[in-house]
Amino acid sequence: MNGIVIVDKPQGWTSQDVTARLRRVYATRRIGHGGTLDPMATGVLPVFVGRATRGVEFFEHAEKTYETLLLLGRTTDTQDVTGATLAEKAVHLSPADIEKVLPRFRGDILQVPPMYSALKVNGKKLYELARKGQEVERQPRPITVFELTNLGFDGTRLSLRVKCSKGTYIRTLCQDIGDALGCGGCMEALRRVRAGEYDIEDAVPLEQLLESE
Protein backbone atom coordinates (compact mmCIF):
# COMPACT_ATOMS: atom_id res chain seq x y z
CA MET A 1 0.00 0.00 0.00
CA ASN A 2 1.08 3.58 -0.72
CA GLY A 3 -0.94 6.38 0.81
CA ILE A 4 -2.05 8.27 3.91
CA VAL A 5 -4.28 6.80 6.62
CA ILE A 6 -5.92 9.25 9.03
CA VAL A 7 -6.04 7.46 12.37
CA ASP A 8 -8.14 8.47 15.38
CA LYS A 9 -5.54 7.62 18.02
CA PRO A 10 -6.95 6.20 21.26
CA GLN A 11 -5.78 7.24 24.70
CA GLY A 12 -2.89 5.26 26.16
CA TRP A 13 -1.09 4.63 22.86
CA THR A 14 2.10 6.39 21.79
CA SER A 15 2.33 7.52 18.18
CA GLN A 16 5.11 4.95 17.73
CA ASP A 17 2.82 2.22 19.10
CA VAL A 18 0.33 3.05 16.36
CA THR A 19 2.84 2.90 13.51
CA ALA A 20 4.35 -0.34 14.88
CA ARG A 21 0.98 -2.08 14.80
CA LEU A 22 0.08 -0.70 11.38
CA ARG A 23 3.35 -2.04 9.95
CA ARG A 24 1.89 -5.48 10.57
CA VAL A 25 -1.51 -4.56 9.14
CA TYR A 26 -0.05 -3.21 5.89
CA ALA A 27 2.92 -5.61 5.80
CA THR A 28 5.49 -2.87 5.21
CA ARG A 29 8.35 -1.29 7.10
CA ARG A 30 7.97 2.00 5.24
CA ILE A 31 5.58 3.80 7.54
CA GLY A 32 5.71 7.02 9.55
CA HIS A 33 3.42 9.48 11.29
CA GLY A 34 2.94 13.22 11.07
CA GLY A 35 2.92 15.14 14.34
CA THR A 36 3.49 13.19 17.55
CA LEU A 37 0.64 12.88 20.06
CA ASP A 38 1.30 12.19 23.75
CA PRO A 39 -0.10 8.89 25.08
CA MET A 40 -2.91 10.65 26.98
CA ALA A 41 -4.01 12.54 23.85
CA THR A 42 -6.50 11.28 21.28
CA GLY A 43 -7.46 12.29 17.78
CA VAL A 44 -6.04 12.94 14.34
CA LEU A 45 -2.77 11.12 13.63
CA PRO A 46 -1.90 10.99 9.90
CA VAL A 47 0.05 7.83 9.08
CA PHE A 48 2.10 7.75 5.88
CA VAL A 49 2.55 4.35 4.22
CA GLY A 50 4.97 3.22 1.48
CA ARG A 51 6.06 5.91 -0.97
CA ALA A 52 3.86 8.42 0.87
CA THR A 53 6.42 8.50 3.72
CA ARG A 54 8.24 11.18 1.73
CA GLY A 55 5.52 13.57 2.83
CA VAL A 56 6.14 13.21 6.57
CA GLU A 57 8.79 15.95 6.84
CA PHE A 58 6.60 18.45 4.98
CA PHE A 59 3.55 17.60 7.06
CA GLU A 60 5.39 18.27 10.32
CA HIS A 61 5.07 22.00 9.61
CA ALA A 62 1.27 21.91 9.21
CA GLU A 63 -0.99 23.83 11.56
CA LYS A 64 -2.82 21.77 14.19
CA THR A 65 -6.14 22.29 16.00
CA TYR A 66 -6.87 20.85 19.44
CA GLU A 67 -9.64 20.74 22.00
CA THR A 68 -8.27 20.63 25.52
CA LEU A 69 -9.56 20.65 29.07
CA LEU A 70 -7.62 22.79 31.54
CA LEU A 71 -7.99 21.84 35.20
CA LEU A 72 -7.46 25.00 37.25
CA GLY A 73 -6.00 25.11 40.75
CA ARG A 74 -3.47 22.30 40.35
CA THR A 75 0.12 22.45 39.07
CA THR A 76 2.08 19.28 38.25
CA ASP A 77 5.62 18.40 37.19
CA THR A 78 4.45 17.14 33.77
CA GLN A 79 1.97 20.00 33.22
CA ASP A 80 -0.87 17.47 32.92
CA VAL A 81 -2.95 15.39 35.35
CA THR A 82 -0.67 12.35 35.02
CA GLY A 83 2.12 14.10 36.91
CA ALA A 84 2.96 14.62 40.56
CA THR A 85 1.20 17.58 42.19
CA LEU A 86 3.50 20.52 42.92
CA ALA A 87 0.92 23.01 44.18
CA GLU A 88 -2.81 23.40 44.73
CA LYS A 89 -4.83 26.59 45.08
CA ALA A 90 -8.47 27.46 45.48
CA VAL A 91 -10.11 28.76 42.31
CA HIS A 92 -12.26 31.88 42.52
CA LEU A 93 -12.68 33.05 38.94
CA SER A 94 -15.47 34.55 36.88
CA PRO A 95 -16.00 34.13 33.13
CA ALA A 96 -14.85 37.75 32.82
CA ASP A 97 -11.52 36.85 34.46
CA ILE A 98 -11.00 34.16 31.83
CA GLU A 99 -11.78 36.46 28.91
CA LYS A 100 -9.40 39.08 30.30
CA VAL A 101 -6.43 36.68 30.22
CA LEU A 102 -6.93 34.69 27.00
CA PRO A 103 -5.90 37.50 24.59
CA ARG A 104 -2.35 37.35 26.01
CA PHE A 105 -1.99 33.89 24.49
CA ARG A 106 -3.21 34.67 20.98
CA GLY A 107 -0.93 35.54 18.08
CA ASP A 108 2.87 35.33 18.07
CA ILE A 109 4.12 34.46 21.55
CA LEU A 110 7.14 32.88 23.24
CA GLN A 111 6.81 29.52 24.98
CA VAL A 112 9.32 27.73 27.21
CA PRO A 113 9.32 24.02 26.29
CA PRO A 114 8.44 21.63 29.13
CA MET A 115 11.02 19.41 30.81
CA TYR A 116 8.87 16.41 29.97
CA SER A 117 9.46 16.62 26.22
CA ALA A 118 11.63 14.92 23.60
CA LEU A 119 13.67 18.07 22.91
CA LYS A 120 17.39 17.58 23.37
CA VAL A 121 19.89 19.60 25.41
CA ASN A 122 23.55 18.62 25.00
CA GLY A 123 22.47 15.45 23.24
CA LYS A 124 20.09 14.29 25.98
CA LYS A 125 16.30 14.30 25.80
CA LEU A 126 14.70 16.59 28.36
CA TYR A 127 12.32 13.94 29.66
CA GLU A 128 15.28 11.66 30.45
CA LEU A 129 16.77 14.42 32.61
CA ALA A 130 13.39 15.19 34.18
CA ARG A 131 12.93 11.56 35.25
CA LYS A 132 16.25 11.82 37.10
CA GLY A 133 14.99 14.88 38.94
CA GLN A 134 17.14 17.27 36.93
CA GLU A 135 15.93 20.55 35.48
CA VAL A 136 17.88 22.55 32.92
CA GLU A 137 17.36 26.00 31.51
CA ARG A 138 15.28 26.07 28.31
CA GLN A 139 15.17 28.99 25.94
CA PRO A 140 11.74 30.37 24.99
CA ARG A 141 10.72 29.48 21.44
CA PRO A 142 8.45 31.48 19.13
CA ILE A 143 5.06 29.90 18.39
CA THR A 144 1.83 31.19 16.89
CA VAL A 145 -1.62 30.65 18.35
CA PHE A 146 -3.97 31.44 15.48
CA GLU A 147 -7.14 30.79 17.46
CA LEU A 148 -7.85 30.39 21.18
CA THR A 149 -11.54 29.94 21.94
CA ASN A 150 -13.28 29.45 25.29
CA LEU A 151 -15.68 26.52 24.81
CA GLY A 152 -16.95 26.54 28.38
CA PHE A 153 -16.00 27.22 32.01
CA ASP A 154 -17.60 25.48 35.01
CA GLY A 155 -15.63 27.19 37.78
CA THR A 156 -12.67 24.79 37.91
CA ARG A 157 -12.39 23.43 34.37
CA LEU A 158 -11.86 25.48 31.24
CA SER A 159 -12.52 23.92 27.84
CA LEU A 160 -10.49 25.46 25.02
CA ARG A 161 -10.10 25.12 21.27
CA VAL A 162 -6.58 25.94 20.06
CA LYS A 163 -5.32 26.33 16.50
CA CYS A 164 -1.54 26.64 16.57
CA SER A 165 1.77 26.35 14.77
CA LYS A 166 4.29 23.53 14.80
CA GLY A 167 6.14 23.17 18.08
CA THR A 168 3.33 24.35 20.35
CA TYR A 169 2.97 22.43 23.61
CA ILE A 170 -0.67 22.48 24.70
CA ARG A 171 0.32 21.24 28.18
CA THR A 172 2.53 24.28 28.58
CA LEU A 173 -0.15 26.60 27.23
CA CYS A 174 -2.56 25.22 29.85
CA GLN A 175 -0.09 25.77 32.68
CA ASP A 176 0.79 29.26 31.46
CA ILE A 177 -2.88 30.26 31.30
CA GLY A 178 -3.40 28.88 34.81
CA ASP A 179 -0.42 30.88 36.07
CA ALA A 180 -1.75 34.03 34.39
CA LEU A 181 -5.07 33.48 36.18
CA GLY A 182 -3.22 33.29 39.49
CA CYS A 183 -4.30 29.78 40.48
CA GLY A 184 -2.15 27.50 38.35
CA GLY A 185 -3.45 24.74 36.15
CA CYS A 186 -2.68 21.58 34.24
CA MET A 187 -4.02 19.80 31.18
CA GLU A 188 -6.71 17.21 31.95
CA ALA A 189 -7.58 16.07 28.42
CA LEU A 190 -6.40 16.67 24.85
CA ARG A 191 -7.92 15.78 21.50
CA ARG A 192 -6.47 16.79 18.15
CA VAL A 193 -9.40 17.59 15.88
CA ARG A 194 -7.47 18.76 12.83
CA ALA A 195 -3.95 18.39 11.44
CA GLY A 196 -3.18 20.24 8.22
CA GLU A 197 -6.03 19.48 5.84
CA TYR A 198 -7.18 16.38 7.75
CA ASP A 199 -10.19 16.65 10.06
CA ILE A 200 -11.33 14.35 12.86
CA GLU A 201 -14.34 13.48 10.69
CA ASP A 202 -11.89 11.92 8.19
CA ALA A 203 -10.22 9.76 10.85
CA VAL A 204 -10.69 6.01 11.28
CA PRO A 205 -10.61 4.57 14.83
CA LEU A 206 -7.44 2.53 15.34
CA GLU A 207 -9.36 -0.51 16.57
CA GLN A 208 -11.22 -0.60 13.25
CA LEU A 209 -7.94 -0.65 11.32
CA LEU A 210 -6.57 -3.43 13.53
CA GLU A 211 -9.53 -5.71 12.79
CA SER A 212 -7.75 -6.83 9.61
CA GLU A 213 -4.49 -7.61 11.46
Each language-model region and where it sits:
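Catalytic/RNA-binding core of pseudouridine synthases
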Residues: 1-213
